[in-house]
């Protein structure tokens, strides 16, 4: 009888060790650090309201307002856990949409060096760079109307002080040499499907030019100048989406 009681107790203890993964939804806000003081005001009692009442986690993540390198910004965080993500876009030239509306493999290259890269035909490649030049190579590895040893003879891909996204035509078998005075990225577009439920909140936004053609207007908002505006709007979008899919009682 004693041994039977011991087995029952052991079974009860074992049952308590079962680990059930958390299914609490997570609402994320990625913001420029000039909003840090405002974000701190909400990171406390306000976040606890939603955690205790709705079992929702509010996660605040910041990036430097002096950095326009979107790849570096989004690679610092695991955004895959976000059920919905709000991004405070500090400057309209920042191409968050390019890297969130599609899946890309990007490689980073050092500045002030010549890089020889082959870009296979039939694939989509683009550069994310500033002050980048390239020289296409012939089948005999000779620069076509450019000298691979002299970067001043290269053809310009991007100019200016902010990062630009530029599609690269894949027309040579032997590839290209690239040179830039700044670090740059070459990216292979794997798919054109968004991998995250995200919304872009522009502080100021001019609906013109190349950027306007790249944006999915269903998730773009303009004139959101404060952290509070972004936070309340993303919460409103989150709860509205839940009401749209959940049956009424």
Curated annotation (Swiss-Prot):
Cellular component, GO annotation: host cell endoplasmic reticulum lumen; membrane; T=13 icosahedral viral capsid; viral outer capsid
Compartment annotation: Virion; Host endoplasmic reticulum lumen
Alphabetized Pfam families for the sequence: Rotavirus_VP7
InterPro entries recorded: Rotavirus_VP7 (IPR008818), VP7 (IPR001963)
Subunit structure: Homotrimer; disulfide-linked. 2 Ca(2+) ions bound at each subunit interface in the trimer hold the trimer together. Interacts with the intermediate capsid protein VP6. Interacts with the outer capsid protein VP5*.
Function of the molecule: Calcium-binding protein that interacts with rotavirus cell receptors once the initial attachment by VP4 has been achieved. Rotavirus attachment and entry into the host cell probably involves multiple sequential contacts between the outer capsid proteins VP4 and VP7, and the cell receptors. Following entry into the host cell, low intracellular or intravesicular Ca(2+) concentration probably causes the calcium-stabilized VP7 trimers to dissociate from the virion. This step is probably necessary for the membrane-disrupting entry step and the release of VP4, which is locked onto the virion by VP7.
UniProt-recorded name of the protein: Outer capsid glycoprotein VP7
Native source species: Rotavirus B (isolate RVB/Human/China/ADRV/1982)
């Amino acid at each position: 009888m004693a041994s039977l009681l011991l087995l029952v107790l052991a079974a009860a203890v074992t049952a308590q060790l079962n680990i059930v993964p958390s299914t609490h939804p997570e609402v994320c806000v990625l913001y420029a650090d000039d909003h840090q003081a405002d974000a701190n005001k909400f990171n406390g009692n306000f976040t606890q309201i939603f955690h205790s009442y709705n079992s929702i986690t509010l996660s605040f993540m910041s990036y430097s307002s002096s950095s326009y390198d979107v790849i570096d910004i989004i690679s610092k965080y695991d955004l895959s856990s976000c059920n919905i993500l709000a991004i405070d876009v500090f400057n309209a030239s920042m191409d968050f949409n390019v890297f969130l509306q599609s899946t890309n493999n990007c490689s980073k290259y050092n500045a002030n060096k010549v890089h020889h890269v082959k870009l296979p035909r039939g694939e989509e490649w683009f550069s994310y760079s500033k002050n980048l030049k390239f020289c296409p190579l012939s089948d005999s590895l000779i620069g076509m109307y450019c000298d691979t040893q002299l970067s001043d003879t290269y053809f310009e891909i991007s100019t200016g002080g902010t990062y630009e996204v530029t599609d690269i035509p894949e027309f040579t078998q032997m590839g290209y040499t690239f040179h830039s005075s700044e670090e740059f990225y070459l990216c292979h577009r794997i798919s054109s499907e968004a991998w995250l439920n995200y919304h872009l909140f522009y502080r100021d936004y001019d609906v013109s030019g190349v950027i306007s053609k790249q944006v999915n207007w269903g998730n773009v908002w303009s004139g959101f100048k404060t952290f509070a505006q972004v936070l309340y709007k993303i919460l409103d979008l989150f709860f509205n989406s839940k009401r749209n899919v959940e049956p009424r009682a």
